[in-house]
Amino acid sequence: MNDFWQHCSALLERELTPQQYVTWIKPLAPVAFDASANTLSIAAPNRFKLDWVKSQFSGRISDLAREFWNTPIEVQFVLDPKAGMRSAAAGAAPAAPRAPLTPNGPAATVAAIAANLTANAAAAPSAPADVPMTPSAAAAHHLNADDADIDLPSLPAHEAAAGRRTWRPGPGAAPANGGEADSMYERSKLNPVLTFDNFVTGKANQLARAAAIQVADNPGISYNPLFLYGGVGLGKTHLIHAIGNQLLLDKAGARIRYIHAEQYVSDVVKAYQRKAFDDFKRYYHSLDLLLIDDIQFFSGKSRTQEEFFYAFEALVANKAQVIITSDTYPKEISGIDDRLISRFDSGLTVAIEPPELEMRVAILMRKAQSEGVNLSEDVAFFVAKHLRSNVRELEGALRKILAYSKFHGREISIELTKEALKDLLTVQNRQISVENIQKTVADFYNIKVADMYSKKRPANIARPRQIAMYLAKELTQKSLPEIGELFGGRDHTTVLHAVRKIADERSKDAQLNHELHVLEQTLKG
């Protein structure tokens, strides 16, 4: 029995992502094998994990058991809280070091860094949670366009006199005192809380994180510009602040500026009104690192786009790094000059997707820990299973649970969580269905909805069907067998193959990744 489980665990570890393996398979333990009845009992430490493993992995474990014993084996799952304790005693694997990425020039694509992610992915389970900017921090960065002065922090006198210097990251000394550190962050507008160390990593963002680390290590050289896009609350702002903070550690005197696109627009307007464009250009053209957040706000602002184009050209010519975020793919941003779009596409463009289940759990557990609350795994899994869209939604739900618990003087449990999130859960229950996914994908690829259920296998039908299966797994709570049934009674192994195939290709194929992003945004409304 133990020999089989070692064999089974080793195979599943190769087939699954590190985070999936650590979350679902590692806590399991074989407890009994009846050779006469051909039954194997496997224990899970809590009810949620038992139900999830039973629905998602029982078929694969049964297949491996049949191959191992050369006879059909009935796999039974039982509840045993000690199973988790036994697994925990084995210890966690040490985090892998950051793997460097090899720059491929200005035409680099997502595929260019995919092959370098092995070491970074291995570190994913131990990475702490994403901590997006709080509303108060965001307000400090996004000054009101009607009452803000032109926001051009002055450089230290000795730097201003020295003129433009070619800068490379090096082992810079830390600020000598707190006042100097405060001044450094005031000039850069960086949030010192947002670092690589407290950014949780999973399949949804590992490419973006790896690219960000590479840029932090080689600013102005590897991928310039770096363009990150994705929905609200997925960690784009966190990552670009992390890059800036890393550069400040490497070189305390670096000229860095984070600015939201709305503030940049406001500054352009005020510079125009006050005839202060020389100062404006002198400041932005002298930076070592420019971080522009939510550039879609440039849409329709022709004068702002013109000034940014000149700043972009000057910075890139001086080997300074430019990093941009948006809520959508560059070519999908309306009202932006074609010259700028072509510049955005000249570097590396990476999508950040909504976090997967294991990543959402890690974010909740870490956030609860930072609030001094011991959140049970069952509650974290319950919340993560029902709230799927972004990190801010998860954190908002957690705050609601904590407030509800404190107000009623009750311990946090699944029952209390259901009460606290009653309105949220009602909305979620009305969301995406497999049928809606099938119709949306069929329309997108110009095939019939009936082809989703048919046995036809030409590529122009089989491919969209696999994509629909992948989206059904990612965006609904249906199990693999349930999804297979809704796709013409297909076996769960067929669905699993489709999910793995599309997930793997997505990490390597920028066009497929873009198509999936469009479909996901369409389905989420």
UniProtKB/Swiss-Prot annotation:
Region (Domain II): 71-188
Ranges for region Disordered: 160-182
Positions of region (Domain I, interacts with DnaA modulators): 1-71
Family: Belongs to the DnaA family.
Main subcellular location: cytoplasm
Gene field: dnaA
Binding site for ATP: 233, 235-237
Subcellular location: Cytoplasm
Subunit structure: Oligomerizes as a right-handed, spiral filament on DNA at oriC.
GO cellular component, one term: cytoplasm
NCBIfam families associated with the record: DnaA (TIGR00362)
PROSITE patterns (UniProt xref): DNAA (PS01008)
BP terms from Gene Ontology: DNA replication initiation; regulation of DNA replication
GO molecular function: ATP binding; ATP hydrolysis activity; DNA replication origin binding; lipid binding
Biased composition (Low complexity): 169-181
Pfam families linked: Bac_DnaA, Bac_DnaA_C, DnaA_N
Region (Domain III, AAA+ region): 189-405
Cited function: Plays an essential role in the initiation and regulation of chromosomal replication. ATP-DnaA binds to the origin of replication (oriC) to initiate formation of the DNA replication initiation complex once per cell cycle. Binds the DnaA box (a 9 base pair repeat at the origin) and separates the double-stranded (ds)DNA. Forms a right-handed helical filament on oriC DNA; dsDNA binds to the exterior of the filament while single-stranded (ss)DNA is stabiized in the filament's interior.
Entry comment, domain topic: Domain I is involved in oligomerization and binding regulators, domain II is flexibile and of varying length in different bacteria, domain III forms the AAA+ region, while domain IV binds dsDNA.
Family annotation (InterPro entries): AAA+_ATPase, Chromosome_initiator_DnaA, Chromosome_initiator_DnaA-like, Chromosome_initiator_DnaA_CS, DnaA_C, DnaA_dom, DnaA_N_dom, DnaA_N_sf
Spans annotated as Domain IV, binds dsDNA: 406-525
Annotated protein name in UniProt: Chromosomal replication initiator protein DnaA
Keywords associated with the record: ATP-binding, Cytoplasm, DNA replication, DNA-binding, Lipid-binding, Nucleotide-binding
